[in-house]
Regions:
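C-terminal transmembrane helical hairpin of 12-TM major facilitator-type secondary transporters
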Residues: 291-350
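Juxtamembrane intracellular "pre-TM" segments in multi-pass secondary transporters
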Residues: 2-16, 200-229
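Helix-to-loop junctions at the C-terminal end of transmembrane segments
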Residues: 71-84, 279-290, 388-389
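A late C-terminal transmembrane helix in Major Facilitator Superfamily
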Residues: 158, 357-391
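Extracytoplasmic gate region of multi-pass secondary transporters
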Residues: 38-40, 225-276
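Conserved MFS/SLC helix-loop-helix module at the cytosolic interface between two early adjacent transmembrane helices
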Residues: 70-108
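Symmetry-related core transmembrane helices of the 12-TM Major Facilitator Superfamily/SLC fold
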Residues: 177-195, 397-412
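Cytoplasmic helix-loop-helix junction between adjacent transmembrane helices
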Residues: 117-153
Length: 420
């Protein structure tokens, strides 16, 4: 066989892995196109449309988060038991997401919304374990890059989704019609994944072991560094339950702000554009200088921005701040741009670090653990809704910011293996 023939054969796996990377990044962008627009613009519309208080609104978030957590863990099991069928599982996730949004769009009452939100959580959650597991297997030498590209797709979706939905809400459709029509592009994205990430032959007998996932889960939990990363992410997720669900509503409801849907969309879009720029840089830096600096720096910055949102009404009353002409809106916009630009970037840095410290095996199991760390976020939307109903938004964001001292301290104490 000629040298050219050998080179051509060796190039095929490389081309296939980059094809899978492009497809999974696109699928992740499609997923977050829905998620970003739903939480940023459509969830507030549901609250206003049904006349919900913050606790009732928080219940929807808690229901969705609970379903999301359960199916993330299930996704980890299937992702590691059937790694050769990752494309099918990703496609099922995207299709299920579209069906879930459609069902929410046709529900006429708040009581019926509650079970419908179980589907809202289930579809998207099934995406990450097989997708990130596949990327980790395909890119063992460039994990930081592959995971950051996966996160880059999320940022793109978070940019495009609010712009599209903001335009539709302002000019063409109401929120229920948007949710009904959303099933079509979701099914189209699922079909694309099926074509570009095809199933492959089973590689080892391990794929047939029904209980491999649970053994891998137990083995992963014996890794102390991985466990501490999971605990840090779990405590961060509690704060995310306040900021993620209630920040868009706060911008719409606060009498000193009263943002329009398009203004909310533009603000979050700008933050995610910054995130899309930062994400690959963080991935590159993580591969070069290590995970700890990026994790501690990112967590500290998110803690600062969350506290700034909560304290903004006090800060603008300080005389030197007044003299500088800084208004409440200036501070809020500044804080949200920081928070939004790092939110997904930091999460995917957690994923990359967890995959790296766990070794080569059971990547989907590790991903399900990382996303399963959101267990503390299950109840936080409802709890923070109760706090908002009693004390208002500012106290809520201050509490969420204070809580981030815990993961920041944990990350500061960790010792990661030296990058070589």
């Amino acid at each position: 066989m000629s040298d050219n023939s050998v080179s051509s054969e060796n190039d095929k796996p490389s081309l296939k892995r980059y094809q899978a990377l492009v497809a999974i990044t696109f699928g992740h962008a499609a997923k977050h196109l829905y998620n970003g627009a739903f939480r940023t613009l459509l969830m507030p519309e549901i609250k206003f449309g049904f006349g919900l208080n913050s606790a009732q609104y928080g219940i929807l978030g808690t229901i969705s988060s609970t379903s999301w957590w359960i199916f993330t863990m299930i996704g980890g099991y299937f992702g590691d038991r059937f790694p050769h069928r990752a494309g099918r599982m990703i496609a099922i996730s995207l299709a299920g997401m579209g069906i879930g949004y459609f069902i929410v769009g046709v529900m006429p009452t708040y009581i019926l919304l509650i079970p419908a939100f179980l589907l809202i959580g289930a579809g998207p959650s099934f995406f990450h374990p097989p997708a990130l597991g596949e990327l980790s297997r395909l890119f063992p030498d460039k994990r930081g890059f592959a995971v950051s590209m996966h996160g880059f797709g999320a940022n793109i979706g978070e940019v495009v989704g609010p712009l599209i939905v903001g335009y539709l809400l302002s000019n063409l459709l109401d929120w229920q019609e948007i949710l009904k029509w959303s099933i079509l592009p979701a099914l189209g994205s699922a079909l694309l994944i099926l074509l570009m990430v095809p199933s492959r032959a089973r590689k080892s007998p391990k794929d047939n072991k029904k209980f491999t996932y649970f053994l891998d889960l137990r083995a992963a939990l014996k890794n102390p560094l991985l466990v501490m990363l999971i605990i840090a992410l779990a405590t961060k997720s509690f704060s995310d339950g306040a900021v993620g669900y209630f920040l868009p509503v706060y911008l719409r409801e606060d009498p000193l702000l009263l943002f329009t849907p398009n203004q909310v969309a533009y603000l979050f879009v700008l933050s995610h554009i910054l995130g899309a720029i930062i994400q690959p840089l963080i991935g590159y830096a993580s591969d070069r200088i290590g995970w700890k600096i990026m994790l501690v720096g990112g967590m500290s910055t998110i803690m600062f921005s969350t506290m700034l949102i909560g304290l903004s009404s006090v800060i603008v009353e300080i005389s030197i701040v007044k003299d500088l002409g800084v208004s409440l809106i200036h501070l809020i916009v500044f804080a949200i741009l920081i928070w939004g630009s790092l939110h997904f970037s930091l999460h995917h840095t957690f994923i990359g670090a967890s995959l790296d410290v766990s070794g080569e095996e059971s990547q989907s199991t590790v991903v399900s653990l990382v996303y399963g760390a959101g267990i503390l976020a299950l109840i936080s939307p409802y709890l923070f809704g109760l706090i908002i109903d009693s004390f208002g938004y500012y106290i809520t964001f201050i509490i969420a910011g204070i809580f981030l001292f815990i993961p920041t301290g944990i990350l500061t104490s960790l010792k990661f293996p030296v990058k070589r």
